[in-house]
């Protein structure tokens, strides 16, 4: 097995066994309207109950989704650092019912909306601070099960 093959196998194994799972969901009352979101983490960094956020100004649903992802990633980084964990050793599984966010962050869809581009760039930058990560889409019912909405 070559070094590249070993590295790829190690990365795949790490993704099969994440240290931290982040589940997030954002939305808006009206679209655009008052933005809100919730996230929960499990594993090496845990929130306990879901963390709830409200966003100032008028937000689209997609903006609120991205903003909640950012809040969740920042939370994991803060808590890891506060407990002496090196974020580069963490393998993060991010789960969402937002097909748009999952596909854009994964690079399969382009970010066409100007307002989402800085949020997308920041999310990608935060994800680079972890050892490895993967985004997974799940049905809306999973978000409801984890977050209560």
Where are these regions (language model features)?
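RNase H-like nuclease fold core
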Residues: 2-63, 67, 74-78
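RNase H catalytic domain
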Residues: 27-31, 70-149
């Amino acid at each position: 097995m070559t070094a590249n093959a070993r590295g790829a196998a190690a990365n795949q194994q790490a993704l099969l066994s994440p240290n931290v799972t982040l589940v997030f969901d954002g939305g808006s009352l009206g679209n655009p309207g008052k933005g809100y979101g919730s996230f929960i983490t499990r594993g090496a960094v845990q929130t306990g109950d879901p963390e709830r956020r409200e966003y100032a100004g008028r937000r689209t649903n997609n903006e609120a989704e991205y903003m909640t992802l950012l809040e969740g990633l920042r939370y994991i980084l803060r808590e890891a650092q506060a407990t002496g964990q090196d974020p580069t050793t963490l393998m993060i599984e991010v789960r969402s019912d937002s097909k748009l966010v999952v596909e854009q962050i994964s690079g399969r869809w382009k970010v066409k909306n100007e307002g989402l581009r800085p949020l997308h760039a920041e999310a990608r930058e935060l994800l680079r601070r972890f050892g490895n990560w993967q985004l997974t889409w799940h049905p809306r019912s999973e978000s409801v099960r984890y977050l209560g909405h």
